[in-house]
């Protein structure tokens, strides 16, 4: 059999060699030369960050895959040219299908590569990145064995780049100049930096955004242009002047204020409004019945509701038009999920030359009130447990007319032992549960709830009940609920506060086998026994990945959980000692512990193809007072999808655990202290595929 495989391989290799020897130029049009590829020679290569970006752009401008390569140039086999030569003569039938399938694109000729145009484009790229003295040339190299085939050699001499010496803002109105000068510290172009048009365009966009956030509604980046002078400071330096374009419209040179607002709410099937009402300065037009509370519409559209500073709310400045606020309004309304279509327009209140007020017009179509979701999955675990699962959820949107959503979700799963042990064919584990949650798109809390955050904020109330059956071991009933406030005061910081979190676990049934295991491991039994866990939790997250110009982002999250302390304090007020164990609530002892968990991640982008990701995590769990052992569900483990992904749960580190034939292998092994760190080298394999 081995000899047969070797012979087949030899035949294939010989066939490839013979096919490669076949001429690929026998059907070329008269006067055309087949393009075989290109090579780029870089002289005086720049090593600056801007230079590396320029080289990437240059490679893209000069690159052209020849017809003499297979699969986009991965293999040096003229497959497409064979197809073209053999099937170009067919007009129908199988031959035409083969041509259309494998050789429909015409061969690449030197004339279609247009090396002259590519040289001009590359020269302009050098100018764009500050290489004003750079030169680009090309040479056509004819194949010595076949004069109808030729390649191209490009020579790029980058020479020395130019750097920015000074940047001036000139010829704008005094008020505009004051705003521009105040924002100069955030400029994308500064003295000493290498000249490049990308930063120049970003600077125009930055200034335009700055002005539009201060009322300049009609201002645009195209209303500014640069003047550059390379003679003032010799030695490769440029003096820049940013000036307004000739004929700058008068409307773009003054701030505007926000006036009245009108809202047109269409029915879910597009029915036009047939009724209206006034709420303060908000004119609401709606179809049949108003499905949104007027005060919520006013809150979302009124600028003063977005300002959390009392002095700013009292000043007239809050009425200034702001591009940032406009984007926030559109984002908030979109996140509600109650509209299938939405459009917001700003227009002058009148046509007079002195008009400085913009009225808002909003048009929106209501979405269908119900959403349904079905999920199916199959799970295979390392302890030979396998089985399917499913969940079905229904969400009712805009329950109280303020963007609230009510969700009900059912879930179920079962597993069976797939190993060859006793009773392995029986379905021996199952789980079912139901949960419901009510989510408000704002902070529902006295005083805090009167103001809006610039970024998403939600309040969630949740109740659930789950039944878990581990055949031959135990049956566990869990139910509870929580109230959680999530808000984001800045772009990089997020807070999650859970002032009330209740978990009640009832161990309904214990088998003889489970009791034997528990006798050998009392801590296991205590962690699974009836438990009442009243807890509070706070989580802070810092993430600067969305911040512009952050090259190496960091992510940090810390969580503090306190359980049973408020309950123990109440018992203490009624005469029960604080450190007395065994105190019960609703017939079950309540847990008392403190838990701290923190995790830090850093991503170092070495270049566009290589990254190093590092991660450090630390956690500690202390049980005291009414309980000496922390609940099983709150303990730590290392490995798995949410930890170090390359290892299964509890299979790495000094606490590694490998339950090969243990009768306890169905239980995850956990601990009360956690420390883990790992470093990953990530490299680009192909386009968006990383290793």
Region spans (language model):
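Interaction-mediating elements
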Residues: 2-3, 23-335, 341-347, 357
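Bacterial N-terminal signal peptides that target proteins for export
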Residues: 1-9
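Short small-residue beta-strand/loop micro-motif enriched in glycine and branched aliphatics
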Residues: 164-165, 306-309, 370-374, 417-419, ...
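Gram-negative/organellar outer-membrane beta-barrel architecture
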Residues: 176-179, 290-291, 321-557, 645-659
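Amphipathic hydrophobic-ligand
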Residues: 131-136, 217-221, 386-390, 432-434, ...
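Strand-connecting loop/turn motifs
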Residues: 131, 216, 369, 401-403, ...
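C-terminal outer-membrane beta-barrel translocator/porin domains of Gram-negative envelope proteins
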Residues: 279-287, 379-383, 496-686
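C-terminal motif of bacterial Sec signal peptides marking the signal peptidase cleavage site
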Residues: 18-21
């Amino acid at each position: 059999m081995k000899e047969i495989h070797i012979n087949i391989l030899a035949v294939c290799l010989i066939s490839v060699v013979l096919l490669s020897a076949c001429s690929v130029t026998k059907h070329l049009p008269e006067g055309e030369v087949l393009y075989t590829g290109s090579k780029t020679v870089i002289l005086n290569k720049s090593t600056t960050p801007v230079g590396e970006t320029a080289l990437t752009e240059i490679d893209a401008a000069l690159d052209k895959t020849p017809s003499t390569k297979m699969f986009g140039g991965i293999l040096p086999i003229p497959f497409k040219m064979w197809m073209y030569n053999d099937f170009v003569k067919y007009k129908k039938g199988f031959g035409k299908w083969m041509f259309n399938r494998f050789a429909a694109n015409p061969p690449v000729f030197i004339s279609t590569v247009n090396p002259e145009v590519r040289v001009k484009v590359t020269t302009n790229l050098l100018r764009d990145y500050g290489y004003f003295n750079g030169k680009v040339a090309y040479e056509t190299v004819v194949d010595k064995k076949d004069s109808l085939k030729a390649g191209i050699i490009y020579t790029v001499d980058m020479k020395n780049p130019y750097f920015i010496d000074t940047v001036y803002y000139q010829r704008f109105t005094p008020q505009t100049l004051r705003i521009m000068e105040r924002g100069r510290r955030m400029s994308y172009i500064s003295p000493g930096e290498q000249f490049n048009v990308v930063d120049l365009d970003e600077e125009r966009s930055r200034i335009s955004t700055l002005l539009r956030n201060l009322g300049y509604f009609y201002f645009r980046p195209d209303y500014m242009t640069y003047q550059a002078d390379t003679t003032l400071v010799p030695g490769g330096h440029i003096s820049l002047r940013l000036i307004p374009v000739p004929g700058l419209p008068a409307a773009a040179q003054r701030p505007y204020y926000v006036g009245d607002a009108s809202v047109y709410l269409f029915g879910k099937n597009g029915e036009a409004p047939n009724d209206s009402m006034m709420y303060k300065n908000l004119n609401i037009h709606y179809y049949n019945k108003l499905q949104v509370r007027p005060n919520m519409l006013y809150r979302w559209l009124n600028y003063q509701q977005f300002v959390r500073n009392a002095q700013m709310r009292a000043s007239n400045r809050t009425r200034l038009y702001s591009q940032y606020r406009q984007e926030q309004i559109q984002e908030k309304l979109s996140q509600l999920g109650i509209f299938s279509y939405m459009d917001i327009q700003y227009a002058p209140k009148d046509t007079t030359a002195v008009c400085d007020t913009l009225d808002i017009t909003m048009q929106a179509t209501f979405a269908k009130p119900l959403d349904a979701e079905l999920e199916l999955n199959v799970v295979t675990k390392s302890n030979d447990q396998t089985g399917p699962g499913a969940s079905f959820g229904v969400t009712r949107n805009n329950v109280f007319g303020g963007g609230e959503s009510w969700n009900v979700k059912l879930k179920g799963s079962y597993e069976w032992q797939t190993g060859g042990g006793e009773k392995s064919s029986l379905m021996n584990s199952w789980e079912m549960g139901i949960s419901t949650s009510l989510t408000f798109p704002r902070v529902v809390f006295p005083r805090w709830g009167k103001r809006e955050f610039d970024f998403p904020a939600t309040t969630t109330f949740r109740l659930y009940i789950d039944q878990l059956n581990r055949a031959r071991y135990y049956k566990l009933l869990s139910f509870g609920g929580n109230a959680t406030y999530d808000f984001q005061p800045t772009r990089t910081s997020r807070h999650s506060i859970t002032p009330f979190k209740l978990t009640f676990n009832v161990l309904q049934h214990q088998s003889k086998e489970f009791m034997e295991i528990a006798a050998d491991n009392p801590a296991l039994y205590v962690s699974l026994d009836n438990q009442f866990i009243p807890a509070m939790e706070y989580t802070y997250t810092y993430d600067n990945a969305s911040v512009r110009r952050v090259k190496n982002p960091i992510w940090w999250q810390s969580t503090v959980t306190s359980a049973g302390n408020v309950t123990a304090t109440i018992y203490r007020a009624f005469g029960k000692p604080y450190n007395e164990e065994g105190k019960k609530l609703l017939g079950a002892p309540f847990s008392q512990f403190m838990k701290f968990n923190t995790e830090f991640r850093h991503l170092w982008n070495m270049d566009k193809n290589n990254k190093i990701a590092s991660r450090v995590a630390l956690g500690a769990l202390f049980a005291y007072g009414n309980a000496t052992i922390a609940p099983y569900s709150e303990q730590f483990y290392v490995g798995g999808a949410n930890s170090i992904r390359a290892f299964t749960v509890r299979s790495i580190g000094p606490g590694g655990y490998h339950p090969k034939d243990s009768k306890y292998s169905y239980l995850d092994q956990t601990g009360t202290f956690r420390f883990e760190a790992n470093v990953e080298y990530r490299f680009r394999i192909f386009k968006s595929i990383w290793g």
